[in-house]
Amino acid sequence: MKFSFKSCEDYFKFYKNDSLIKVSDNNPLLAINFQHAELILKDLKNKEVKTDPFSVLGLSVFASSLDKKKVNEIIGIILKDLDFDLLLFRLFDDKKLLKTMNKKYDPFIKNFNEKFNTKLTFIQDFKKNANCVTNKKLFKKFMLKLNNFHLTAFFKFSSI
């Protein structure tokens, strides 16, 4: 079997014995740049990697197969998970743990707020979560601008 890739507009497409590799009925396997294409090509040649959903090939197949409906589902999952995010959840009495979390996670949350122009707050009450709809709308708007590959990476990392 001979695997190759060719540049096509803004992406690289992959071929197996000169036939386009498709990940679904309508979607070809794509890469966003030359280095990404070379990593996928390496994985295509390595049979063991094909079953690993977190390999470059596995993530690329996932991203290449996304349609608008799936993109909206993923964004919905990310926004829903934000309501009970473990970095934001601070409703417990363990002072040592709270101090450690404040030290290690607060800079990350501050950076996130600046990067995405939001104001995520700590979850300190089950009934009321101050991470309001406005912040989620801004974040959703940002995520809708991401290409499928960047959204896939964000989704997979946020699900770990």
For each feature predicted by the language model, list its residue ranges.
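Glycine-rich loop/turn
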Residues: 1-29, 35-47
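Short, charged/polar micro-motifs that form catalytic or ligand-binding hotspots
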Residues: 27-30, 95-98, 151-156
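Generic, well-ordered alpha-helical segments
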Residues: 29-32, 54, 70, 100
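Predominant activation on well-ordered alpha-helical scaffold segments within soluble catalytic domains
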Residues: 38, 106-109, 160
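Short secondary-structure junctions and interdomain/linker hinges
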Residues: 47-51, 85, 115, 119, ...
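A glycine-rich, hydrophobic loop/mini-helix early in the fold
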Residues: 48-91
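Internal, conserved structured core segments that host functional sites
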Residues: 73-135
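A mid-sequence, solvent-exposed acidic-amphipathic segment
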Residues: 119-160
